[in-house]
């Protein structure tokens, strides 16, 4: 497990491109046959990829957590962005095709991840945050989620937001997680942009061609910086930072948040005139 520490806005003012990428970009997430996780001290979120091939994988306990098993004091969200597979939760196997999700509550001890075809493995994107209460495990299908459609084709930001782990779908302590699909011809996500001082967020960008890039903007609104992001890479967004991006071609992204509350619309909008 890789660890990333927190930063003040003043810390990053003079960062080089290399320094910024080292601190806020996670480049290697889905590695066949491996579990790749990142522990960010921003609200203590753990996120990453589980990519089983010819044998099941489990999330092994790390000394950073100081507990006897991974979800002893945590909850977990999962979305499959790869081939068909399954997760085995305390002996019960659940099939997971692409876009299927799962919420797994605190105190769940045994979780295994499997792929049907090692040549086309499942890619389980996982996000875990601290939890104070055990809520029921819930299987989540994108087919059962009413998307929130927002933006407009004239502003190149028309998109459908599927809220997977959200009070309308399932209970959670503080984790929110969802899947945003841009309408063909749109390029911007989360524009106009915002911050939310009460929550941090991560973005996983995927479903991108090899030569497609997303220019992900971050930083304080009056002092923005950017990360150039390739397929299946993720960005860490502290609570004080804007988080918005524009793609050179089609892409999809998964967002995940945690912090003080689970009120999706609790955000501070940034007028375009204030961006620099």
Residue ranges and their predicted role:
Residues 214-217, 246-253:
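Short conserved catalytic/interaction loops centered on acidic-Pro-aromatic/His motifs
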Residues 96-116, 228-249, 258:
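Conserved metal-binding segment of the jelly-roll/cupin
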């Amino acid at each position: 497990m890789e660890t990333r520490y927190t930063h003040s806005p003043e810390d990053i003012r003079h960062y080089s491109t290399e320094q910024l990428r080292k601190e806020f970009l996670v480049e290697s997430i889905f590695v066949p046959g491996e579990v790749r996780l990142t522990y960010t001290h921003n609200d203590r979120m753990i996120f990453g990829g589980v990519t089983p091939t010819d044998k099941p994988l489990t999330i092994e306990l790390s000394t950073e957590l100081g507990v006897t098993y991974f979800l002893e004091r945590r909850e977990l969200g999962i979305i499959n962005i790869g081939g068909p597979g399954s997760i085995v939760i305390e002996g019960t196997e659940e099939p997971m095709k692409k876009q299927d999700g799962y919420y797994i509550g605190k105190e769940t001890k045994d979780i295994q991840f499997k792929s049907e075809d090692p040549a086309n493995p499942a890619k389980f994107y996982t996000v875990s945050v601290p939890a104070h209460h055990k809520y029921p495990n819930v299987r989540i299908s994108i087919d059962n989620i009413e998307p929130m459609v927002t933006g407009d084709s004239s502003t190149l930001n028309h998109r459908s937001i599927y809220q997977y782990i959200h009070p309308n779908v399932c209970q959670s302590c503080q984790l929110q997680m969802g899947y945003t699909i841009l309408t063909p011809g749109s390029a911007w996500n989360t524009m106009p942009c915002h911050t939310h001082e009460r929550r941090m967020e991560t973005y996983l960008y995927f479903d991108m061609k090899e030569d497609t890039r997303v220019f992900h903007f971050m930083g304080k609104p009056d002092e923005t910086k950017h990360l150039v992001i390739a397929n299946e890479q993720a960005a860490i967004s502290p609570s004080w930072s804007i988080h918005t991006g524009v793609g050179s071609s089609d892409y999809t992204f998964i967002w995940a948040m945690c912090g003080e509350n689970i009120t999706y619309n609790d955000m501070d909008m940034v007028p375009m005139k204030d961006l620099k």
